[in-house]
A protein has these predicted regions:
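Catalytic cores of soluble, metal-dependent hydrolases
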Residues: 4-92, 103-104, 110-113, 189-296, ...
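Active-site flanking residues adjacent to catalytic metal/cofactor-binding acidic residues
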Residues: 17, 96, 121-123, 170, ...
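Active-site histidine-anchored catalytic micro-motif
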Residues: 90-156, 259-260
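Conserved N-terminal phosphate-binding loop of PLP-dependent enzymes in the Aspartate aminotransferase
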Residues: 297-703
């Protein structure tokens, strides 16, 4: 085995080398970049990925004339890098200006006994020589120096010249013609932003990695943060517009440091003084963390080994979401027709909601309800105005809001209705899903949800869903409340008979029983009305909201009722440390405004009609579908369990770039973000039609 093979086969530990130098830059702004990134937690970010990381050393720029001082700095850096590689570490060099690359990559080559391939990610070519440079700043010269041309202070560092055939430059958009001619004459491959925009970064990165890692040989990565667009990374020495996005670059370099052939990583040109909000530092750390991240299969294995086995996810590891689209760790895009069980009704990373989250997070996040905050009253005011209820009690998850409603109902039963203490009954329906706490599980009819978790609280009853007569028969003088979903989502998108909720409302009113609607999934426009109960023109005594209320960013939920119900709560009766916090209140209030401003309720009704019409067309063309059910953008495809199963079909849709989820193995849930366009919805429906057509062709033919 060669020395190179031995080196690259070692299990790496990352060793940080900070370089406090701006000797090659026009200003000293980047001198403190390495130390600033250290304070921002760059070591911890790497440890989060499961790799070992430690700070090796910090190198200070020596005093003296500029070029001799730079030469001394480069020699010291090259020696440190060489020692790190030789001992099996992966050096992560943090600058400082890009001139330090002339030391980093000579050091790697010296350790290898041969030149590494080099992936150079930069807005600029940095391929000037002293004769061609307009500014004569050394940070514009390191790539030429590494190819053996330039000032002796930068070229006469121990280690081999780079092989131009194994150098690839990505992200370039600002350079002088002399630089491009210099690199072209030597055969260095340059991938500019125009090509990246035309072909996509993933395709360009694949070509670049094939160049730098040709013949299975070792390589490294030099990242000048100015490769990023200034909107993401303003804190750089020489910003240049129309650059790379952080998320797309993170995906493109994902896991590269775990590649046994990647021997070193370098990040340069970070200027803390120009990064008041810390955007650039976070971008740099995010990119390095992405390069250290395990691959999708490894991440699934880690979760399986370290997490509880209470979920069986579809085999995809998602890493980014924008609007109605999600991307996995490999950059594959998927249309989201699940929207996290309606939690992402406003789409992923809605710009207004993200801006509100970021702004509020820098002001005030959590104080507990021991004090007032300036955001909660405004949220409560808007929420009650919009829904028409007098009061709202904010908590976090849907489960908490359901528990809050049950507590309110029981105390109302005891203190207002006059039910004997500890005798207040709650009625729910078979097939319900209200959460998974002990009390709520006691209301469930699903055997798996109940198995092994008893005993459950007393005075909990269940009746058939959709049967108003069964409700009337179940009510006793001790009944405090009837808890019902307007549409049973987890139960299979089950819609009750027309007039059912109205009949239940009349029965409850006649017997002085609270009607509480669980609208955690159906509320806030999902079904084409603000509340799903409005389809039956009823106003429940209490409504439970959640999921979409947090804008897809935070867990926010609430129980809404009028004073006659909410009066039962006195200080100390109920609470939640995070419930009603300023951050959640700000985001939820903005989510309500987005709902109104973008007319998402009306949009859900219109697109929902299209969705259901197309699903019925698909069903008519296949024996695999037994029924189509839904309202608004909330639909279910029930399949014939004798012919197929919903999980298999969901996996087939995943393979075609569509994310859905089965429920109980027989129903495929369709609930896209309310922001989905007609074109996006049609694209997803076409994939659904194709999957059912393919599955139908595989059915055995009758004899």
């Amino acid at each position: 085995m060669s020395a190179t093979s031995k080196l690259v086969a070692l299990n790496p530990m990352l060793r940080f080398i900070g370089v406090a130098s701006a000797l090659g830059a026009p200003s000293p702004d980047c001198r403190d970049g390495a130390e600033s990134l250290r304070r921002m937690g760059i070591e911890a970010a790497i440890r989060r990925t499961g790799l070992d990381a430690g700070w090796g050393t910090s190198i200070e720029a020596p005093d003296g004339p500029r070029l001799p001082a730079l030469a001394a700095l480069l020699r010291e850096l090259a020696a440190e890098v060489r020692g790190s590689v030789a001992t099996g570490h992966v050096p992560v060099v943090l600058g400082g200006d890009h001139a330090i690359a002339a030391g980093t990559w000579r050091g790697v080559g010296a350790a290898l006994g041969g030149a590494p391939g080099l992936l150079w990610i930069d807005a600029h070519l940095d391929a000037h020589t002293p004769d061609s440079s307009p500014s004569h700043n050394a940070h514009g010269m390191p790539l030429a120096a590494l190819l053996g041309v330039g000032a002796p202070e930068m070229t006469r560092i121990a280690g081999p010249d780079l092989d131009p055939a194994r150098v690839a430059v990505i992200g370039v958009r600002s350079y002088e013609a002399e630089e491009m001619r210099f690199l072209a004459a030597r055969g260095v491959q340059v991938f500019g932003m125009a090509e990246i925009l035309r072909r996509g970064l993933a395709a360009v990165m694949a070509d670049a990695l094939a160049i730098v890692g040709a013949d299975d040989s070792p390589f490294g990565i030099s990242l000048d943060i100015d490769a990023l667009d200034p909107q993401f990374a303003p804190g750089v020495t020489t910003p240049s517009d129309n650059g790379l996005g952080v998320a797309e670059l993170a995906t493109a370099i994902g896991g590269l440091i775990r590649n046994r052939r990647c021997l070193a990583f370098e990040i340069v040109e970070y200027c803390p003084s120009r990064d008041a909000l810390g955007l650039t530092a976070r971008a740099a750390i995010e990119l390095l963390e992405a390069a250290c991240r395990p691959g999708g299969e490894a991440l699934q294995c880690i979760e399986a080994a370290r997490g509880a086995s209470n979920y069986a996810p579809l085999p995809v590891v998602l890493s980014e979401g924008r609007g109605c689209w999600l991307s996995d760790v490999n950059g594959q895009r998927y249309l989201d027709l699940m929207s996290a069980y309606s939690a992402v009704s406003f789409g992923h990373a809605h710009p207004r909601l993200v801006a509100t989250l970021a702004s509020q997070a820098t002001r005030l996040a959590v104080t507990s309800r021991a004090y007032f905050n300036d955001r909660l009253p405004l949220f409560l005011n808007r929420l009650t105005d919009l829904t028409g209820y007098e009061r709202a009690l904010p908590v976090n998850t849907g489960l908490e809001a359901v528990e809050t409603a049950l507590k309110a109902a029981r105390k109302w039963g005891h203190k207002v209705k006059g039910i004997a203490e500890d005798c207040a009954e709650i009625i729910a329906c078979n097939g319900n899903f209200h959460g998974r706490s002990i009390a709520i599980t006691g209301l469930s009819s699903e055997p798996q949800y109940r198995d092994g978790f008893g005993p459950f609280p007393p005075a909990l009853k269940r009746i058939p869903y959709g049967d108003a007569a069964a409700l009337e028969a179940a009510i006793t003088p001790n009944t405090a409340a009837f808890l019902v979903e307007p549409i049973q989502g987890e139960g299979g998108i089950i819609i009750p008979p027309e007039g059912y909720l109205a009949a239940c409302a009349e029965i409850c009113k006649r017997h002085n029983v609270l009607l509480i609607a669980d609208e955690v999934q159906t509320g806030l426009g999902r079904t084409g009305h603000l509340l799903a109960t409005q389809h039956d023109r009823i106003r429940p005594d209490g409504v439970i909201l959640g999921k979409a209320l947090g804008g897809g960013l935070l867990p926010v939920s609430a129980f809404l009722a009028d004073e006659r119900v909410m009066q039962v709560f006195k200080p100390g009766d109920h609470g939640s440390t995070f419930g009603g916090n300023a951050l959640s209140a700000a985001v939820a209030a903005e989510a309500l405004e987005v709902l109104v401003d973008e007319r998402l309720v009306e949009r859900s009704a219109a697109l929902g009609a299209m969705l259901l019409a197309r699903l019925h067309e698909i069903a008519a063309a296949t024996p695999l579908i037994r029924a189509i059910r839904g309202r608004g953008l909330f639909a279910g495809i029930e399949v014939d369990a004798a012919l197929t199963d919903a999980r298999t079909l969901a996996e087939a849709l995943l393979a075609r770039g569509v994310l859905t989820k089965d429920t109980h193995g027989t129903v495929i849930r369709i609930a896209p973000p309310l922001t989905i366009s007609e074109e996006e919805l049609e694209w997803g429906l076409q994939r659904i039609a194709e999957v059912f057509a393919d599955a139908g062709r595989r059915l055995p033919r009758a004899a």
